[in-house]
C-alpha cells in the first residue's frame, strides 16, 4: 500500500504548556490533528472552570492563521475541587474530562491527590453526570519499584475505585503494561485506555543501553519488551477501548540534559508518520483510522471528524527536524531509531 486516507485524527492526551512554549509547539499538533485533550498540569495548574476558560483562550490565540483546531479542556483534580464547578464546566461544554494525578507522579503533579477519599464528592458527581475521569495510573509510594507503579495502581487504587463507583467512566491514560491492557480488556464497561506513540516503539533499553538517553525518558517510564508488544497488539486490534493519546510533552533541552532531567517525549510533529510505520509493520494499516480517528471520539461521546488526511509512502525517508526552536528554547523531537517513509500530505 502506497497511500492511506483516514478521517482527520485527534490526540486524546496532549501537553501544550503555556506562553512561549505553547506558541512554539501548537502548530505541530494543529497542522494534523483536529482536536486534543489538553493536560492541565501548568504552573499553577488548571483547577477551575475559570482557569480552563482562560487557558483555552490562550491556546486559540496561539493558533496559526488558517489552522482549525479545538482544544478539549480538562481540570486538574485536587482534594479541594468543587463538584458544582466541575458540573457547571461540563454542562457548558467547556470541560471534557477531569484529570487525576497522584501527587508526585509526573511533571507538575505535586498539587495532585494524596487522599482519594477527599476527592470522592467530585468523583461521585462526575459519575452521576457522565463526565470521564482521566487517570495517570501510577502509585508514588517510595517502596514501589518504578517499573511496577502501574500494576500496583490498578490493584490498590483503580480497581477499588471502580468497584465503589462502577458508573464512573475512566480513561487509563498512557497505558504502558500488559497488566493495564489486560485490565481494560477484562472490564465490562466504563473503562478505556489511551496509548502513546513512543510506548509502541521503545522499551526501557532505549533509555539505558549505551548510556543514559534522556530524550527517551518519560513517565510512565517505558517498560520491558513484552509490555511494548502487548501495547502494539492492543493498538492494532481495532478494539474500540484503545485509542491514541500521544502524551507529547515538550521540555527545553537544558531541562532534559542535566543531572535530574524532566520526564517527557515530544512526538507531535512526527506521530502520524511513526504510527503508519508501526501499523504497516504489524500488517494493520486498515486499523490505523480506528486507533487515531474513531475510537477516541466514540469513547468521549463526540462525532468523528469529517475532514480527511492522506498519508503517502515515500521512497526516500521523510526528514523531520532533530529539534524545534521555541521562544522558550530548543526542544528535541522524538527519534524512533528507524527511517520514516510515511508522510502526511498537505491538504488541498
Swiss-Prot record:
<dbReference type="InterPro" id="IPR002195">
    <property type="entry name" value="Dihydroorotase_CS"/>
</dbReference>
<dbReference type="GO" id="GO:0044205">
    <property type="term" value="P:'de novo' UMP biosynthetic process"/>
</dbReference>
<feature type="binding site">
    <location>
        <position position="247"/>
    </location>
    <ligand>
        <name>Zn(2+) 1</name>
    </ligand>
</feature>
<feature type="binding site">
    <location>
        <position position="41"/>
    </location>
    <ligand>
        <name>substrate</name>
    </ligand>
</feature>
<protein>
    <recommendedName>
        <fullName>Dihydroorotase</fullName>
        <ecNumber>3.5.2.3</ecNumber>
    </recommendedName>
</protein>
<comment type="similarity">
    <text>Belongs to the metallo-dependent hydrolases superfamily. DHOase family. Class II DHOase subfamily.</text>
</comment>
<feature type="binding site">
    <location>
        <position position="13"/>
    </location>
    <ligand>
        <name>Zn(2+) 1</name>
    </ligand>
</feature>
<feature type="binding site" description="via carbamate group">
    <location>
        <position position="99"/>
    </location>
    <ligand>
        <name>Zn(2+) 1</name>
    </ligand>
</feature>
<feature type="binding site">
    <location>
        <begin position="15"/>
        <end position="17"/>
    </location>
    <ligand>
        <name>substrate</name>
    </ligand>
</feature>
<feature type="binding site">
    <location>
        <position position="136"/>
    </location>
    <ligand>
        <name>substrate</name>
    </ligand>
</feature>
<keyword id="KW-0378">Hydrolase</keyword>
<feature type="active site">
    <location>
        <position position="247"/>
    </location>
</feature>
<keyword id="KW-0665">Pyrimidine biosynthesis</keyword>
<dbReference type="Pfam" id="PF01979">
    <property type="entry name" value="Amidohydro_1"/>
</dbReference>
<dbReference type="InterPro" id="IPR006680">
    <property type="entry name" value="Amidohydro-rel"/>
</dbReference>
<comment type="subunit">
    <text>Homodimer.</text>
</comment>
<dbReference type="InterPro" id="IPR004721">
    <property type="entry name" value="DHOdimr"/>
</dbReference>
<feature type="binding site">
    <location>
        <position position="219"/>
    </location>
    <ligand>
        <name>substrate</name>
    </ligand>
</feature>
<dbReference type="InterPro" id="IPR032466">
    <property type="entry name" value="Metal_Hydrolase"/>
</dbReference>
<feature type="binding site">
    <location>
        <position position="251"/>
    </location>
    <ligand>
        <name>substrate</name>
    </ligand>
</feature>
<dbReference type="GO" id="GO:0004151">
    <property type="term" value="F:dihydroorotase activity"/>
</dbReference>
<keyword id="KW-0862">Zinc</keyword>
<comment type="function">
    <text>Catalyzes the reversible cyclization of carbamoyl aspartate to dihydroorotate.</text>
</comment>
<dbReference type="GO" id="GO:0005829">
    <property type="term" value="C:cytosol"/>
</dbReference>
<feature type="binding site" description="via carbamate group">
    <location>
        <position position="99"/>
    </location>
    <ligand>
        <name>Zn(2+) 2</name>
    </ligand>
</feature>
<feature type="binding site">
    <location>
        <position position="263"/>
    </location>
    <ligand>
        <name>substrate</name>
    </ligand>
</feature>
<keyword id="KW-0479">Metal-binding</keyword>
<dbReference type="GO" id="GO:0008270">
    <property type="term" value="F:zinc ion binding"/>
</dbReference>
<feature type="binding site">
    <location>
        <position position="15"/>
    </location>
    <ligand>
        <name>Zn(2+) 1</name>
    </ligand>
</feature>
<feature type="binding site">
    <location>
        <position position="174"/>
    </location>
    <ligand>
        <name>Zn(2+) 2</name>
    </ligand>
</feature>
<feature type="modified residue" description="N6-carboxylysine">
    <location>
        <position position="99"/>
    </location>
</feature>
<dbReference type="GO" id="GO:0006207">
    <property type="term" value="P:'de novo' pyrimidine nucleobase biosynthetic process"/>
</dbReference>
<comment type="pathway">
    <text>Pyrimidine metabolism; UMP biosynthesis via de novo pathway; (S)-dihydroorotate from bicarbonate: step 3/3.</text>
</comment>
<feature type="binding site">
    <location>
        <position position="136"/>
    </location>
    <ligand>
        <name>Zn(2+) 2</name>
    </ligand>
</feature>
Amino acid at each position: 500500500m502506497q497511500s492511506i486516507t483516514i478521517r482527520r485524527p485527534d490526540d486524546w492526551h496532549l501537553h501544550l504548556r503555556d506562553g512561549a512554549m505553547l506558541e512554539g509547539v501548537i502548530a505541530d499538533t494543529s497542522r494534523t490533528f483536529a482536536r486534543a485533550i489538553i493536560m492541565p498540569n501548568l504552573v499553577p495548574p488548571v483547577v477551575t472552570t475559570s482557569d480552563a476558560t482562560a487557558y483555552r483562550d490562550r491556546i486559540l490565540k496561539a493558533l496559526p492563521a488558517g489552522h482549525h483546531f479545538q482544544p478539549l479542556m480538562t481540570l486538574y483534580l485536587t482534594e479541594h475541587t468543587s463538584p458544582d464547578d466541575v458540573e457547571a464546566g461540563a454542562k457548558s461544554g467547556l470541560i471534557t474530562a477531569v484529570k487525576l494525578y497522584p501527587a508526585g507522579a509526573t511533571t507538575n503533579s505535586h498539587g495532585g491527590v494524596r487522599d482519594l477519599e477527599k476527592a470522592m464528592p467530585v468523583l461521585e458527581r462526575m459519575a452521576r453526570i457522565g463526565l470521564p475521569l482521566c487517570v495517570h495510573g501510577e502509585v508514588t509510594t517510595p517502596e514501589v519499584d518504578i517499573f511496577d507503579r502501574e500494576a500496583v495502581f490498578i490493584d490498590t487504587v483503580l480497581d477499588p475505585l471502580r468497584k465503589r463507583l462502577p458508573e464512573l467512566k475512566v480513561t487509563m491514560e498512557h497505558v504502558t503494561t500488559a497488566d493495564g491492557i489486560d485490565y481494560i480488556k477484562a472490564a465490562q464497561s466504563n473503562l478505556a485506555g489511551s496509548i502513546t506513540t513512543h510506548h509502541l516503539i521503545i522499551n526501557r533499553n532505549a533509555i539505558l543501553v549505551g548510556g543514559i538517553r534522556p530524550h527517551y525518558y518519560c513517565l510512565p517510564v517505558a517498560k520491558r519488551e513484552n509490555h511494548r508488544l502487548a501495547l502494539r497488539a492492543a493498538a492494532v486490534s481495532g478494539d474500540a477501548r484503545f485509542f491514541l493519546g500521544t502524551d507529547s510533552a515538550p521540555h527545553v533541552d537544558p531541562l532534559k540534559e542535566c543531572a535530574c532531567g524532566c520526564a517527557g517525549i515530544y512526538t507531535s510533529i512526527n506521530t502520524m508518520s511513526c504510527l503508519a510505520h508501526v501499523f504497516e509493520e504489524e500488517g494493520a494499516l486498515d486499523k490505523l483510522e480506528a486507533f487515531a480517528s474513531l475510537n477516541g471520539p466514540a469513547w468521549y461521546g463526540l462525532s468523528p471528524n469529517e475532514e480527511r488526511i492522506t498519508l503517502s509512502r515515500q521512497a526516500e525517508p521523510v526528514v523531520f527536524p532533530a529539534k524545534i526552536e521555541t521562544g522558550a528554547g530548543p526542544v528535541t523531537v522524538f527519534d524512533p531509531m528507524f527511517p520514516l517513509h510515511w508522510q502526511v500530505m498537505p491538504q488541498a
